[in-house]
Amino acid sequence: MLSRKGIIPEEYVLTRLAEDPAKPRYRARQRRARFVSKKGNCNVAHKNIREQGRFLQDVFTTLVDLKWPHTLLIFTMSFLCSWLLFAMAWWLIAFAHGDLAPSEGTAEPCVTSIHSFSSAFLFSIEVQVTIGFGGRMVTEECPLAILILIVQNIVGLMINAIMLGCIFMKTAQAHRRAETLIFSKHAVIALRHGRLCFMLRVGDLRKSMIISATIHMQVVRKTTSPEGEVVPLHQVDIPMENGVGGNSIFLVAPLIIYHVIDANSPLYDLAPSDLHHHQDLEIIVILEGVVETTGITTQARTSYLADEILWGQRFVPIVAEEDGRYSVDYSKFGNTVKVPTPLCTARQLDEDHSLLEALTLASARGPLRKRSVPMAKAKPKFSISPDSLS
């Protein structure tokens, strides 16, 4: 009979002994699928596409969109296939002219020094890449050889233009610049100017600026129309305020972008309790602008789910003036602090102003209580005697 130690691993036994048998077990709640990931990738899988030929109508964009291993494979195979194809053409020309058979005559060959397929392949590489070793060359004996030489040069230039252009576009893609455009991990909802506001922080790590930068926000949620139609991804635009009006921003330093939750806001009926149970809420943030150094339009994206929105908190300041210039402490980029915030929806706050007045009064009493603390009288370190004044 086998012992228990031989059947169950020791690590498993120690783990089970450390567990509390009275503590109930909970399975991790499955998180809602994001429409846009935190890194900006769209979480959409395209299936059952019937018209695959549409991708071949725009070959260049298809090549640029491919992954790097596939692009490098196509890059290598395009050159190898063209070299082999024209090597076969040069070998057939030499075979038809009788240049492959050894002869003692003085007949001039179509291409000198071609005696096998290997030499024809080397000559094909020399022609297309213009290496020019000088051991093989086309003569005036065969007009067809001259025509093949012209065609191979044209085809080689086309392959170079397409493939090298594809490699350049992949290395200079706009989303590379978006890697240094950062968003705060969490968004916050707090009072600003007496109104509930949805706020997030955005920054740029590079010194080169984003010209004509604009920012947009959308709420994506699952809705049902009065007719019973279920819309799984209903998108609603969110108006924003950034202190300068409009959606344009001057991103020379990290900015706090905020949206006033008013009657026109899709977040007007959002309560603090909904942030823990509202699984269909996702706020997408899109930052778009022109890269100053390259002139390419770039776009950075992120999203916030309901559990990534902090109620009653505010971002800490990270910009300070030092030695006549402004410095940014990115170690506190996503840090927040708790602030007094009503635990109600923006609609309830607009309908009952006493909630805001009570909160304002409570906030005003806080500093007064600190001031009423009795302070010990400081004893003087020296005294002046009357004799010294005489």
Swiss-Prot record:
Domain of life, source organism: Eukaryota
User: What catalytic reaction does the record list?
Assistant: K(+)(in) = K(+)(out)
The residues that the entry says bind K(+) 2 are: 133
Q: Which GO terms describe its molecular function?
A: ankyrin binding; ATP binding; ATP-activated inward rectifier potassium channel activity; ATPase-coupled monoatomic cation transmembrane transporter activity; potassium ion binding; transmembrane transporter binding; voltage-gated monoatomic ion channel activity involved in regulation of presynaptic membrane potential; voltage-gated potassium channel activity
Keywords linked to the UniProt accession: ATP-binding, Diabetes mellitus, Disease variant, Disulfide bond, Ion channel, Ion transport, Membrane, Metal-binding, Nucleotide-binding, Phosphoprotein, Potassium, Potassium transport, Transmembrane, Transmembrane helix, Transport, Voltage-gated channel
Q: Which residues carry this modification: Phosphoserine?
A: 385
Tell me which residues are marked as the site Role in the control of polyamine-mediated channel gating and in the blocking by intracellular magnesium. Answer: 160
The residue ranges for the Cytoplasmic side of the membrane come to: 1-65, 172-390
Which cysteine pairs make disulfide bonds?
A: 110-142
How is the enzymatic or functional activity of this protein modulated?
KATP channels are regulated by cytoplasmic ATP/ADP ratios; ATP inhibits the channel by closing the pore, while ADP activates the channel. Activated by phosphatidylinositol 4,5-biphosphate (PtdIns(4,5)P2).
- Residue positions annotated to bind ATP are 48, 50, 330
Please tell me where K(+) 1 binds in this chain. 130
Describe the intramembrane regions by residue range: 117-133
Sequence intervals crossing the membrane: 66-92, 143-171
User: Where along the chain is a 1,2-diacyl-sn-glycero-3-phospho-(1D-myo-inositol-4,5-bisphosphate) bound?
Assistant: 176
The record describes its membrane topology as: Multi-pass membrane protein
One GO cellular component from the entry? plasma membrane
Q: How is it modified after translation?
A: Phosphorylation by MAPK1 results in changes in channel gating that destabilize the closed states and reduce the ATP sensitivity.
Q: What is the effect of changing residue 201 to H?
A: In PNDM2; ability of ATP to block mutant channels greatly reduced
**Is the Cytoplasm keyword given for this protein?**
no
**Domain remarks in the Swiss-Prot or TrEMBL record:** There are two PtdIns(4,5)P2 binding sites: A canonical site where the phosphate groups of one PtdIns(4,5)P2 molecule are coordinated at least by residues Lys-67, Trp-68 and Arg-176; a non-canonical site where the second PtdIns(4,5)P2 molecule is coordinated by both KCNJ11 and ABCC8/SUR1 residues.
Q: Which disease shows up in the entry for this protein?
A: Hyperinsulinemic hypoglycemia, familial, 2: A form of hyperinsulinemic hypoglycemia, a clinically and genetically heterogeneous disorder characterized by inappropriate insulin secretion from the pancreatic beta-cells in the presence of low blood glucose levels. HHF2 is a common cause of persistent hypoglycemia in infancy. Unless early and aggressive intervention is undertaken, brain damage from recurrent episodes of hypoglycemia may occur. HHF2 inheritance can be autosomal dominant or autosomal recessive.
**By what name is this protein known?**
ATP-sensitive inward rectifier potassium channel 11
- Species for this entry: Homo sapiens
Gene behind this chain?
A: KCNJ11
